[in-house]
Swiss-Prot record:
Parts of the chain that traverse the membrane: none
HAMAP family: DapB (MF_00102)
Name recorded for this polypeptide: 4-hydroxy-tetrahydrodipicolinate reductase
InterPro entries the UniProt entry points to: DapB_C, DapB_N, DHDPR_bac, NAD(P)-bd_dom_sf
Gene3D superfamilies, A to Z: Dihydrodipicolinate Reductase, domain 2 (3.30.360.10), NAD(P)-binding Rossmann-like Domain (3.40.50.720)
Main location class: cytoplasm
Catalysed transformations (reactions): (S)-2,3,4,5-tetrahydrodipicolinate + NAD(+) + H2O = (2S,4S)-4-hydroxy-2,3,4,5-tetrahydrodipicolinate + NADH + H(+); (S)-2,3,4,5-tetrahydrodipicolinate + NADP(+) + H2O = (2S,4S)-4-hydroxy-2,3,4,5-tetrahydrodipicolinate + NADPH + H(+)
Signal peptide boundaries: none
GO molecular function: 4-hydroxy-tetrahydrodipicolinate reductase; NAD binding; NADP binding; oxidoreductase activity, acting on CH or CH2 groups, NAD or NADP as acceptor
SUPFAM superfamilies: Glyceraldehyde-3-phosphate dehydrogenase-like, C-terminal domain, NAD(P)-binding Rossmann-fold domains
The protein's role, per its UniProt record: Catalyzes the conversion of 4-hydroxy-tetrahydrodipicolinate (HTPA) to tetrahydrodipicolinate.
Keywords from the named record: Amino-acid biosynthesis, Cytoplasm, Diaminopimelate biosynthesis, Lysine biosynthesis, NAD, NADP, Oxidoreductase
Binding site for NAD(+): D32, G74, T75, T76, S99, A100, N101, F102
Amino acid sequence: MKFTLIGNGRMGQQVAHIINNSSAHSIAAILDVDATITPEVFHGSDAIIDFTVRHAFLENLPAMVASGVPIVVGTTGWDDVQADVRQQIAAANTSLLYSANFSLGVNIFMRIVREAARMIEPFSHFDIALTEQHHTGKADFPSGTALRTAQMVLAANSRKTSIVRELADGNKLTPNELHVASLRLGTIFGKHSAFIDSETDDIEISHTAKSRSGFAAGAVEAAAWLALRHTTAPGFYTMDDFLDEKLGK
């Protein structure tokens, strides 16, 4: 398959490296984040892979949608306009797959945490909290992956109804609040953890990224999946949909 890449930063370069070393895929074009995008630039591509920034993604979205080529988006920070993006995708009868993290390992981690949160729900003496660690260059916190994991915990455990990102001096957590703590240090690629605690024992579930290659490989695999899915069932997808199909659910 042929992919057009938008964004030539660290993730974009890693995606290009994965594709260039693949016998099954090739690069149709690599577009810089500041490039002028028209629908025509995507002709001949089986899918678009976007790793840019919020403003660039939203500015380029109309051209991507108009091209009719399925879109894979790793750009984060646009959850507040996701309803509008979904509407654009539906109106054009095209396809978009979005994930804050394409690593297969971290998506498996999130499912394990969701199941753990569900299992402790009947036992009030168990509590749960999340942490995420990244390099100092990462601007957003908590990470999109941590927030997605937190949302999955809230959906699985009715005892948790809201997310707390920071604690002000003197404030205490209430039992219904899920604490999501962030750390920025050095060159950490990314570590996400769930801590489950009780008076008698504790459980820790963690995922540690060793490099960006896992994120990039997952994005390429998701793009190939979406390109095939688009022909029969266009729509807005996430890595949950990708994994559900792979797992036969």
